Amino acid sequence: MNKIAIFGSTGHIGKNLISFLTNDRNYDLILFSRNSKKNEMLDNLFPESSLVIEEYDKFESDEYDVIINCIGITNPVDITKYYSKILEVGEFYDNKIINFLKKSPSTLYINMSSGAVYDTKFDSPVDDKTPTILDINHNNSVHYYALSKINSETKHRLNSELNIIDLRIFNFFSKYIELNSGFFLSELINAINNNMKFVTNDVDFVRDYINPYDFFSLIKNCVQTNNINDTFDVYSKEPISKSRILEEMSNRFDLEVEIIDKDAFSSPTGFKKNYYSISRKTAKISYEPKYSS
């Protein structure tokens, strides 16, 4: 049985991992959280799972086969609001794990990184040859988020003797998403739930949403991997465009869509026309998604 510690267990991805891992007898979970009120939420979400939830100051007192780090400010609303804390929070918990690994080198560290590390305009999808381009003279909330992820990944590669996998997540969606998070799909679902017209601009874009089942499959493959220090772009079987999403939602839920001038909206994390990767390096750890976006 693999003993797995999860940092950021009350977040969107953390909840998904709990939902899958608690139903698999191969895994024993130790969850870590800073917010006791959110801990109660986890107990309510998974009442039959007998969750073990600890505070972070207890982390070093135990041993783990795997540590999964889901900590981070990820939704557009919070990135804009708390951008000054992004680097500080990410650095603190990442260092905590790195220091643990140096004393326990057999432990595997799976870190949730982001496609934002490329810090590009995403005029086209990225691949294994895409460089990271930083405009260091014009920092904003978008760059601080990217810098936080770049900082972590760089540190991980420098510690090449440690077992670390960085998973660059571009888009992820599930029933555990917070509908006030400011993501395109969460706003779309809010419109459907409230029988409201969905207003958007006339600019199309492409996204790649990994299915939770595929994501769990990827995590299992990572857990079974030994002696590795690498990064992987996460992808589904096929991406999807905004226009197709709107068409599907309109047909299935009678959603009324109003298209207005493209300059009427701006994203707090910057516009990304093709926010996905065509890298298939993850095949190295036998990952093959079954589901499209």
Segments predicted by a language model, with ranges:
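N-terminal Rossmann NAD(P)H-binding glycine-rich loop of SDR-like oxidoreductase domains
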Residues: I4-D24
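SDR active-site strand-loop-helix element
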Residues: F7, F32, C70, Y109-G115, ...
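NAD(P)H-binding glycine-rich loop region in Rossmannoid oxidoreductase-like domains
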Residues: S50-E91
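Short alpha-helix in the Rossmann-fold core of NAD(P)-dependent oxidoreductases
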Residues: Y82, I86-I97, L101, I110, ...
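Conserved Rossmann-fold NAD(P)-dependent oxidoreductase catalytic core, especially the SDR/UDP-sugar
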Residues: K96-V142
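Active-site Tyr-X1-5-Lys
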Residues: N137-I165
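NAD(P)-dependent short-chain dehydrogenase/reductase
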Residues: T154-R207, P212-F216, M249
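C-terminal substrate-binding subdomain of Rossmann-fold SDR/epimerase-dehydratase oxidoreductases
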Residues: N195-M196, T200-S293
